[in-house]
Each structure stands twice: as C-alpha cells, then as structure tokens.
C-alpha cells in the first residue's frame, strides 16, 4: 500500500501547449486504502506470472479507480463537491480532537482496527459510533455550553462522519466492477451467468426484474412520441400557446422515474421548454459532467454504464489491442490522446505493455482536453496524468506525460512535440463530435483537427464515434432523428437495468451521458450547440479527405469483441463489421462505430513521400 501511496514524481514532466502548467502535489502521498485485500494479493504477484496479453483481469482498473478515490479524499479540487468533502473531513477531525486533548492516546485506542501508518484514516461506522457516544470526558470540558448547544453539537458529531464513511464504503463495493474491459476467465463465467438470468425475457417482452409494469398501461394509452413531435412542430412555427398546451399534456403522462418512453418524454419536454424560454438550467455549454456532480457519483454512473452496455468496453478493447500489436517491437511509444478525460482507457494497455516480451517500451502520453471553466483550465487532465504516472510506476513502465488544455482546432503541431524515433498513435474515442463543423465556421474546425491528425503522421489513428444523423441545421429534421436515436438508448437502459437500487445511478447516467447532449441538440442553435454527430459513412468521407486510408481490424480482435458482447451483455446488443468498421448497436440500430486508419502517404523526416 505504501508503494501505491508514496510514489516518486521524479522525471514526471508537465508541458501545456496553452501555457498553464502545474507542479505535482505532495498531498497525494497518503490516503486510505479502500481495497486492502486486493493490494496485498497484487503485491505478492509478479508481472511475469502470465504471458503478455490485453485485458485479462480487472486489477489494473481497480488500482486506477482506487487511486482516483484517494485523490478525491486528499486533494481539494476546484469543484464544489471537493470543498464539501474537505469540510466534512475537517469537521470529523475537530470531533476527534474535542473528544480528548491527548491526541496520541486517542489515536492509539481508535486505531486497533485500522492500519497505523495511514495519515488520513476513516474508521468504520461502528468505530465512529462508539467513539462519538462515549465522549463523556470531553463533554466535561465544555460545561459552559447550555444544554441546547450540547444537543446540537452531539447531533452534528453523530451524523456527519457516519454519512461520509458509509458513502465511501458503499462506493468501494460498487466500484469493484467499474470496468468490464479486464476480467479473468472465472469472472467472465460468473458474469455470463448473471447476465443470462437477467436477460431472460418474460411474456411482456421485458427482462426479469423490471418494475415498470404498472406504468405500461399509461404509456400505451398516450402516444408520447407523437405528442413530442407535435410540440416540436409548434415550437418550430413559433406557436407558443399550442406548444405550451402540448407540454402540459406531455408532463401529465411523463416522469423522470417512469419507463424508457416516459423518461425520454420528460427530458425532451424539458429541452423543448428551454428552447421556448431561452433559459437552460443548469446551463449546458460543454460535454463535461456538471460541476455539481461529484467524482464519486461519476464513477458510480460509469460503472453502471459499462456493466450494462458494451460500447466503451469493446471500443477500448479493440483500440488497446490494436495499439499493443503495433507496439510489440517498438522501443518508444507516443500516444496522443484527444479526449483523455479520466484516463479509463489506459490501465489495461499499461498492464499489457509491462508484460511485453523484452520489457515495456518508453511510453509518452500527450493528454489533450478542452479547457475547464475557472482559474485552472487544465486541472482535470493534470490529475489524470498524475494517476497514470503512479500506475505506471507500479508496473515499472517508463512513462512521461504532457498535457494540453485548449480548443482542439487551435493546437499546433509544435505543441505536440512529435519525435521522429517514436512509434506514434493518435487516439480519439467518442469525442470528435464535439468539435464544430462547417455549419459553425467556413474553415470547419472539425476538418482542421483531422488535418492536425494527418500532420502528426501517425503510425496508427484509432477512431470511434457515435453514429448519429441528428446534425441537420433544420430543427424539425434534427428533432425527429434525435427522437429515434435517444429512444433506442432509453429503451436499452430500460431493458438492461433492473435492480431498484440502481435506478438512482441510472438517473445520473442518463442525465450526464444522454440528456446533456439531447438538451444541446434540441434547445440550442449555432455555436451553442456543441453535440454534432455524423454517421460513420460521413466520418469515413471526412477521414479519407484528410489523407488517411483504412487499416484492417484483425479478425482476432473482431472475434474477441463479439465474444465479449455475447458472453457478458444482453442478447439484443449487436456487433458487426462493415468496410473496415466495427459497428455496435441495439436491436438492429447502429449506435457506435469504431475504425483504425493509417496515413495514405507516409512522410519521412524531410516531408518527402515514400
């Protein structure tokens, strides 16, 4: 555990093309281990115990997620939730100090059930309760307070730490399967059994465990999709009175806690109302999760998504496997990741590179993100770099991380520091749709970014994106296509998420993953509309025009990806190939597409065609 918490940052360089840099923080050197048994077992194993492969077990991701949670505990970020966390911690330590002035004795008595070498220790709920109840000695030191103040103080002491600790304990359990990219064979078989039981349809055509039967009758009596279309037509024709009447009718038959159709209608009605009033609350200006959403909740929602939907799992698997095959003989590997965000894609690849015959290559990652609002536009990507660095140190992978936080179309080739002796990979997964196209600017920032990809002259360009047709400049055309697209997604979550205790996470997932984009598509116009998807055939034309040619996805990768979907997920998920694209969808509708590309003409150092 000490090795995970006290990692040297020597040789860890941060370089930001936008000019804002930060130094590694020292307060990440200590924290609380949420997976103690896991780390002990991992420290006893050797990286050479098994042959090199990609995504065989979930230990890399568990380490990575545990690291993120410790960062959440120990580091005061710019988000409001981080400040609230730190306030809760300060209150917790104030309580302990108030219980006894002799901190050494209190520490020794309260650490019988915990590790003594932890700088920030969050005891179990039982320990908290006993310590807080048996506080008579400390209470005698505050007899100048009246009885009412003592009661309020006791309530504060008893409630706040228990809530915080129980939340972290619950999160530790739920995050064990946060990514299904890496699984052991035994875990695969167990997961397959669970999914098979959950996916068996009943006579109503829904999976077992669904609790929305009581709401089906109401949905069948009112055609909510038709009402939404009529409301959108009224909005498009500026008939505010008719649009308001339709909105009232939709709200009477929709709910954020109903079945898939009811939830779709509820959120689309909110988007239509925002378009009418011009008031979007909360404001939607970028694809990032809301600043009021904590990292804890984001991880819970992400865990639920990868547990019920294979999109990210198979795309990350295919991307990592393709990069690994390219890097089998490379001595230096440079990955330029456009849209690195939290870095969930990389733990399994790093683990595989550590087991490569002959040792791992020198790995350099350039993480690129859009700037955050506030005084620290690069804060998120810097934190991702620190976590990846500590993770690489665990597996002895030589690592260097550079970051850039600025609009992608403004990035220059010099900022990326491409070295001729490196094997270079450009990675862009599910993020290019958020770059404006020619309908916003005649120069087409989207084509500018693709041209930058080509100027990098990569050995491999890994690309995945949403297959969507709701990017029309005409509102009604865009609305109808968005209605079809999101109907499939809400139906997918409605079918695959059964447990009632997951409904809260489903609501968060839909709000942050689906509703933000839908709100942008429906309520915004011009440059304010940040979600601009295209079909995979349209992406193909753009990428070919930028100077790339398709790279064949190996049959082995396609076979293993299909096995992942078949064994772990609902039978209505589909995966197929078309003209060097790996396509994924739900009930026959293609939703996501993945492909690999290479430069049509490879350039030498002197920019000569070869």
UniProtKB/Swiss-Prot annotation:
Residues 424-520 are annotated as: PFYRE. One of its GO terms (molecular function) is DNA-binding transcription factor activity. Residues 32-54, 98-159, 186-220 are annotated as: Disordered. Residues 215-598 form the GRAS domain. Residues 523-598 are annotated as: SAW. Highly expressed in roots and at lower levels in leaves and sepals. Expressed in siliques. Keywords: Nucleus, Transcription, Transcription regulation. InterPro entries: TF_GRAS. It holds the Pfam family GRAS. Residues 383-415 are annotated as: Leucine repeat II (LRII). It is found in: Nucleus. Coiled coil: none annotated. Residues 302-367 are annotated as: VHIID. GO terms for cellular component: nucleus. It comes from the Eukaryota. Disulfide bonds: none annotated. GO terms for biological process: regulation of DNA-templated transcription. Residues 41-52, 99-119 have a biased composition (Low complexity). Transmembrane segments: none annotated. Belongs to the GRAS family. Probable transcription factor involved in plant development. This is Scarecrow-like protein 11. The lineage of its organism: Eukaryota, Viridiplantae, Streptophyta, Embryophyta, Tracheophyta. The gene is SCL11.
């Amino acid at each position: 555990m000490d090795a995970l918490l006290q990692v040297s940052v020597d040789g860890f360089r941060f370089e930001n093309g936008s000019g804002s840099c930060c130094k590694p923080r020292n307060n990440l050197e200590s924290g609380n281990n949420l997976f103690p048994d896991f780390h002990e077992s991992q420290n006893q194993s050797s990286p050479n115990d098994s042959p090199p492969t990609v995504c065989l077990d979930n230990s890399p991701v568990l380490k990575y997620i545990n690291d993120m949670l410790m960062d959440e505990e120990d580091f005061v970020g710019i988000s409001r939730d981080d400040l609230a966390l730190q306030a809760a911690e300060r209150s917790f330590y104030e309580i302990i100090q108030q219980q006894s002035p002799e901190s050494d004795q209190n520490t020794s008595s309260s650490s019988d059930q915990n590790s003594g070498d932890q700088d920030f220790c969050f005891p179990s709920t039982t320990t908290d309760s006993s310590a807080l109840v048996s506080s008579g000695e400390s209470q005698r030191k505050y007899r100048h307070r009246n009885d009412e103040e003592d009661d309020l103080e006791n309530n504060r002491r008893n409630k706040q730490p228990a809530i915080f600790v129980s939340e972290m304990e619950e999160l530790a359990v739920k995050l064990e399967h946060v990514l299904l990219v890496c699984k052991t064979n035994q875990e695969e078989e167990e997961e397959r059994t669970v999914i098979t039981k959950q996916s068996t349809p009943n006579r109503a055509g829904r999976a077992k465990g669904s609790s929305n039967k009581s709401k089906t009758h109401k949905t069948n009596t009112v055609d909510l999709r038709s009402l939404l279309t009529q409301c959108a037509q009224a909005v498009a024709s500026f008939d505010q009175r008719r649009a308001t009447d339709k909105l009232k009718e939709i709200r009477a038959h929709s709910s954020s806690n109903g079945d898939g159709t009811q939830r779709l209608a509820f959120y689309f009605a909110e988007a239509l109302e925002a378009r009418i009033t011009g008031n979007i609350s909360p404001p939607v200006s970028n694809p990032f999760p809301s600043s009021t959403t904590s990292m804890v909740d984001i991880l819970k929602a992400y865990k639920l998504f990868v547990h019920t939907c294979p999109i990210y799992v198979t795309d990350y698997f295919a991307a990592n496997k393709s990069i690994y095959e390219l890097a089998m003989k490379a001595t230096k590997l440079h990955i330029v990741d456009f849209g690195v965000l939290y870095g969930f894609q990389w733990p399994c690849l790093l683990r595989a590179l550590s087991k490569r015959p002959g040792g791992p290559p020198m790995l350099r990652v350039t993480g690129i993100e859009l700037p955050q609002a506030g005084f620290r536009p690069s804060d998120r990507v810097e934190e991702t770099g620190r976590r990846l660095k500590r993770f690489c140190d665990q597996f002895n992978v030589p690592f260097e991380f550079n970051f850039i936080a600025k609009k992608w179309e403004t990035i220059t080739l010099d900022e990326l520091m491409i070295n001729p002796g490196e094997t270079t990979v450009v990675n862009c997964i599910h993020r290019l749709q958020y770059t404006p196209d020619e309908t916003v600017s005649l120069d087409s920032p989207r084509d500018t970014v693709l041209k930058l990809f080509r100027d990098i002259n990569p050995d491999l360009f890994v690309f995945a994106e949403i297959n969507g047709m709701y990017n029309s400049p005409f509102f009604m055309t865009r609305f109808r296509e968005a209605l079809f697209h999101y109907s499939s997604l809400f139906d997918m979550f409605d079918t695959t998420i059964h447990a009632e205790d997951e409904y809260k996470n489903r609501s968060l997932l839909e709000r942050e993953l689906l509703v933000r984009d839908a709100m942008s598509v429906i309520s915004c116009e011009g440059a304010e509309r940040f979600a601009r998807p295209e079909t995979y055939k349209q992406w193909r034309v753009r990428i070919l025009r930028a100077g790339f040619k398709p790279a064949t996805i190996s049959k082995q990768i396609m076979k293993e990806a299909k096995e992942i979907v078949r064994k772990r997920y609902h039978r209505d998920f589909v995966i197929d190939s078309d003209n060097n694209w790996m396509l994924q969808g739900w009930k026959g509708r293609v939703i996501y597409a993945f492909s690999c590309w290479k430069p049509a003409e490879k350039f030498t150092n002197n920019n000569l065609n070869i």
